[in-house]
Amino acid sequence: MDKTKIHKMWIADQGDGTYSNPILYTDYSDPDAIRVGEDYFMIASSFCNTPAVPLLHSKDLVNWKVINYIMDKLPFEYYDKPVHGCGTWAPAIRFHEGTYYVFIPMPDEGIMMCKTTDPWGKWSEPVYVRKVVGWIDPCPFWDEDGKAYMVTAFARSRIGFKSMLYMSPIEPDCSGVLDDGQFIYDGHATQPTIEGPKLYKRNGYYYIFAPAGGVKPGWQTVLRSKNIYGPWEEKIVLHQGNSPVNGPHQGAWVDTPDGQDWFLHFQDVGNAGRIVHLQPMHWENDWPVIGVNAVDGCGEPVLRYKKPEVGAAYPIDTPEDSDFFEGDRLGLQWQWNANYKKEWYDLKDGQLLLHAQTADPKTQLCDISNLLLQKWPAPEFSTTTCLHLEQMKDGDVAGLVSLGGCYTALAVQKINGKMSLQQRTGNWTKDDEVRTGLGEWNSDVIYIQMKVEKETYRTFYVGTTEENLQPVGQMVEATPGRWVGVKDGLFAINEQGAAGGSVAADYFVYQSL
C-alpha cells in the first residue's frame, strides 16, 4: 500500500478561516466538552467498547485528535463479553481546582467518576458517585459557595420513566451524594424525553442545557432559574429549521479565551452514528441563541461558518483512521468489542499480530469479544487490509468485519489443513447468522477490501495483490447498532476449542471513493 495515496477522510477546516459541519463525521456520541486555558477537551459515550470513553483534544474547536481514554476497561466482569447498548452512556467532563473530573453513567450499575490532574496521563479507577439503576447523563457543578451538585436524567428502559431531571447535592470531591436529592423538572408536557442535562451558571442564573424530543427528531432546550432547584423557565434554542441537520442537540457550551461562545452537539445520521457539529452561540436577554436565522430566540444549524477566534492558527488535523501498525501500541482509533486482554494481539516488525481466541462455533460474530474495531470516518469510503495466513491453525477463522445492527464479514477459514473463503452475515438482535462458503483460498496472503457506498451498501473484494481485487460474496446493507454507528475492523478466532494460530495484518487503510 502506497502511503502517499492515503489522505485524511473528513476535513472540517476549509483552510480559509472557515469550517464546515459536521466537524467530525464520526460516531462520537453524546459529546461534552470544556475549555481549560487554551485547550479544549471533549469526551463521548462508548457503551460496551473498550478502552472506554474517548477523550479528544483541540486548540480551535474544529481540528480534533483522540488523546486518551478515561477507562481502560469496564469495571464489571460481565463486560468481558459484548453487552450491546449497555456500558458507558452520556458522560460529562469538568475541571475544578486543578483536577479534571469525568462522570460516567452506567445505566445498569450507577454513576461512576474518574479524575486526573493530567488528561494525557492515567485516569483514576472509577468509583461510585451513586450506585443506582436507571440514572443517566450526570453532570457535576460547583457553586461559588463551594457546594457541589449533580444533575441527572432517567432511562425508562431501566427505571420505568423518563422526561424528568433530578438534582443531588454531592461531596465537593465527588466521592458520593450528600442526601437523596429531589426531582427538579418534569418535561412530559412540553419537553418530552428531556435528558443529557449540562449545568452552568451565568449572570446569577443557573442554566441546564438539555436535549428533548428524541434522538433523531429532537431539539435543544435550555432551562434557567435563580435557584438551583428551580422553578425553571424553559426555551427551545436550537432546532432543525430549514437545515438538513436533524435533531441538533445534546452537547456542550464552551467559550474562547476572548469571550466567544460556541455549542458542540451531535446529529444522528443512522449508520455512521452520532456525528459532531459546532454552532456559533450568543446571548440575548440572558438566553443563549444557538446557530443562525433565529426566530424568537431559536436558531438552526450552520453548514459553514467562520472558525472560532482563538488567537492563533493551528494545523488542519483529524482523528486517526488508517493504521500501518508501526508503533509499539495500538492507535487510539481502535476499540475492542468488550473488555480486552493484552494477549489477544502483538505489534511486531510493522505488523499487527492477531492471536485466534477460542470461540464457541454457535456464537454469532457480533457477540465475539476480540473484534478490533473503529468508527466509520466518512459517508463513503473503502477499507483495505492485507493479511498473512501462514500461522493459521485448523479451526481458525480470520478476516475483516463490519459490525452494526446488521453485520457482515469476509473471512478465511482453515479446516483439515485447507483454507477457504467465507462470508458471515447476521443481526445482533437475532440468532440467525448465515455462513456462506465462497470457495477455496490457495494463498498465504489475502487482500480484503470493503467498499461502503451511500453510507449503506457494503461490498467485499479479495485478491492476492492490491491490483487483482475481485468482488466476492453478497452486498449487505448496513444498519446501526444499539445506540451506535457501524464499526469496521479485524478479528481472529478458533472454533475447534483449541489454542489457535495467528494472522498478521500489514495495514488497515481507509480511502475515499
Predicted stretch roles:
Residues 1-513:
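Carbohydrate-active catalytic/glycan-binding domains of CAZyme proteins
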